[in-house]
């Protein structure tokens, strides 16, 4: 398994729009590109950390061309909500002891 850690700095008063666009884009990537999903965490009022899981680095690197046309609009909205988007880490999983019993929301 492979994981990518992202950091998003969101513009004032754009948090709800950002979260909605992030959810929509993440769902599309999961459905069409073979990701294993992602989690979004709030760091500060306008800063978020997400990690996305993939079967392997190659699947992640080759993703992007299978998305439906509406993904471009969702991506544009998400980017417009942010002052900065960066990849903090690209990580190969050594051990996985994470279990999810409940979902947030």
Predicted regions and their residues:
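An amphipathic, aromatic/His-enriched active-site/gating alpha helix that lines ligand/cofactor pockets
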Residues: 27-36, 53-89
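Short amphipathic alpha-helical segments
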Residues: 12-37
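Active-site-flanking beta-strand signature of metal-NTP-handling nucleotidyl enzymes
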Residues: 2-8
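Glycine-rich beta-strand-turn "strand-cap" elements at beta-sheet edges
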Residues: 2, 37-49, 72-105
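Intrinsically disordered, low-complexity regions enriched in Ser/Pro/Gly/Gln/His and often acidic
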Residues: 15, 47-53
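Short coil/turn motifs at secondary-structure junctions
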Residues: 11-13, 43, 55-59
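Hydrophobic pocket/interface hotspot
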Residues: 6, 18, 22, 38, ...
């Amino acid at each position: 398994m492979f994981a990518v850690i992202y950091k998003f700095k969101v513009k004032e008063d754009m948090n709800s729009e950002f979260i909605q666009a992030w959810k929509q884009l993440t769902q599309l990537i999961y459905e069409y590109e073979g990701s294993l999903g992602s989690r979004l965490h709030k760091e500060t009022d306008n800063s978020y950390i997400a990690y996305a899981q993939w079967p392997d680095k190659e699947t992640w690197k080759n993703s992007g061309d299978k998305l439906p046309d509406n993904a471009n609009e969702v991506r544009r909205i998400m980017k417009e909500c942010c002052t900065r988007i960066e990849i903090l880490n690209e990580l190969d999983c050594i051990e996985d002891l994470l279990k999810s019993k409940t979902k947030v929301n």
